[in-house]
Design a protein with these regions (language model features):
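Alpha/beta enzyme core
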Residues: 2-200
Length: 200
């Protein structure tokens, strides 16, 4: 099995997948040596390692370069933070092809405006549900390997509230994305409610 098939199997289990964050080859190697099953290339961590804030300043090319270094260093499946896809649906086609080309197992795409902000900062804005659906449809159509996972992330919790975040996540799931990421739930109750309210 290749790393994409491994990740799909891990996501299909009925148990939690812990994928610690990394930002370069060394930090990814530490995740692997600690015995985890996958690693997450964090956009925020990449930005901080470059000495800049996570407010959309890191380019796709810089993220791709860092992701390629990580993929070359470890055998773990790598989930890469692709921010907003670096633009609209047209940009997202290239984003998917580039991340797929370098061998990451999955990317997640968020529904913030471009340029985006770290999901834990105030002042975030999200695009319309319709625009995000078009972006996700473009991403799904652009991949050439069906095992390359597309994860849809919503930052609507901190903008419009929990119910809107769930409504968006349910819409994303209906499009056929491989996983859903509801950013920044504000309680254990919300965390538990997310999988109950979003269909498999």
């Amino acid at each position: 099995m290749n790393s994409r098939q491994v990740l799909k199997r891990l996501l299909g289990r009925d148990e939690l997948l812990v994928a610690p964050g990394c930002f370069d080859g060394l930090s990814a190697r530490l995740v692997e040596e600690a015995g985890f099953d996958a690693a997450y290339l964090s956009g925020g961590a990449v930005a901080r390692s470059m000495g800049i804030p996570d407010i959309g300043l890191v380019t796709m090319s810089e993220t791709i370069e860092r992701a390629a270094q990580v993929v070359a260093t470890v055998k773990l499946p790598i989930i890469a933070d692709a921010d907003t896809g670096y633009g609209n649906a047209v940009n997202l086609v290239r984003t998917v092809r580039e991340f797929e080309r370098i061998g990451v197992a999955a990317i997640h795409i968020e529904d913030q405006i471009t340029p985006k902000r770290c999901g834990h900062l105030d002042g975030k804005e999200v695009i319309s549900l319709g625009e995000m659906e078009k972006k996700l449809e473009a991403a799904l159509a652009a991949r050439t390997d069906s095992d390359f996972c597309i994860i849809a992330r919503t930052d609507a919790r901190g903008v419009h509230g929990f119910d809107d975040a769930i409504a968006r996540a349910r819409s994303f799931a209906k499009l056929g994305v491989d996983a859903i990421f509801v950013e920044a739930p504000q309680s254990e109750q919300e965390l538990a409610e997310i999988p109950r309210r979003i269909p498999d």
